[in-house]
Swiss-Prot record:
Belongs to the NmrA-type oxidoreductase family. Isoflavone reductase subfamily. Its EC number is 1.23.1.2, 1.23.1.1. NADP(+) binds at residues 10-16, 35, 44, 142. One of its GO terms (biological process) is (-)-secoisolariciresinol biosynthetic process. It catalyses: (-)-secoisolariciresinol + NADP(+) = (+)-lariciresinol + NADPH + H(+); (+)-lariciresinol + NADP(+) = (+)-pinoresinol + NADPH + H(+). This is Bifunctional pinoresinol-lariciresinol reductase. Dimer. The keyword Acetylation does not apply. GO terms for molecular function: lariciresinol reductase activity; pinoresinol reductase activity. Pathway: Aromatic compound metabolism; phenylpropanoid biosynthesis. It is an enzyme of class 1 (oxidoreductase). Reductase involved in lignan biosynthesis. Also involved in the biosynthesis of etoposide, a chemotherapeutic compound of the topoisomerase inhibitor family. Catalyzes the enantioselective sequential conversion of (+)-pinoresinol into (+)-lariciresinol and of (+)-lariciresinol into (-)-secoisolariciresinol. Abstracts the 4R-hydride from the NADPH cofactor during catalysis. PANTHER family: NMRA-LIKE DOMAIN-CONTAINING PROTEIN (PTHR43349:SF47), PINORESINOL REDUCTASE-RELATED (PTHR43349).
Amino acid sequence: MAKSRVLIVGGTGYLGRRMVKACLDQGHTTYVLHRQEVGVDIDKIQMLLSFKEQGAHLVEGSFNDHRSLVEAVKLVDVVICTISGVHIRSHQILLQLKLVEAIEEAGNVKRFLPSEFGMDPARMAHAMEPGRATFDEKMVVRKAIEDAKIPHTYASANCFAGYFLGGLCQFGKIIPSKESVILSGDGNVKGIYVDEYDIATYTIKTMDDPRTLNKTIYIRPPANILSQREVVEIWEKLIGKVLDKSSLSEEDFLALMKGLSHGHQAGLTHYYHVSYEGCLTNFEVEDGVDASKLYPQVNYTTVSEYLKRYL
């Protein structure tokens, strides 16, 4: 079977650049949307040119130009969007509604994978404000996709390793300390940590798979379902040293929101649901929607392997 042609929207972003690489690595004809809004951002322009050198095709388009989106979509079989939903960076989830309109008009897309890649928003109706907006907006996009009867796959990838493992699962830290760590409560709530390139690898595998059509797929590498304490213990073994540990209660953690910017408050509430509530592991996932069981051939990065880069 011929491999699908793919359009990546948001290809210069944190996850998007990895999605482009995984798409090329798996042999797909890959198009990357070159948005006019990039302007004179030299880093993004250079990244786009590097994609071209690796074999990707650049196609111009803009969320402010409906016709350009339609023409870009007509080039491919699959559209993957990775634009940011992170409040402290650039929160753009609802821009995807314009992409949905373009896909509906083009009429040729066999699969659309919108920008999800975190917690499953369908399970987060109880989420705290202001972070709840992220999940609500993703559900608005889902409804638009389903109302338009666009074939789709939603990918729930849980915790990006760089944001969580890098700081030993501490909010606001992305480099592991060799001296001390603050535990969230007792540190025993389990999370799921996934290398960002592995997220892309699994995602690309789902897009041509009839088993994943119109489903939510959960990326849950079994060896990476760990508590914060377990992550810290792995780091301690790597550095040959026991860290000084203190604990931050749920109440004290929530009190940190006072005086923070809206974006940081949103991020803090997401972290709360993961690290105190355990929202990623308080439900069972069926084999048919578990990416690690659908694609056992993927040699994913373990927590220990990921943390070695910080030594």
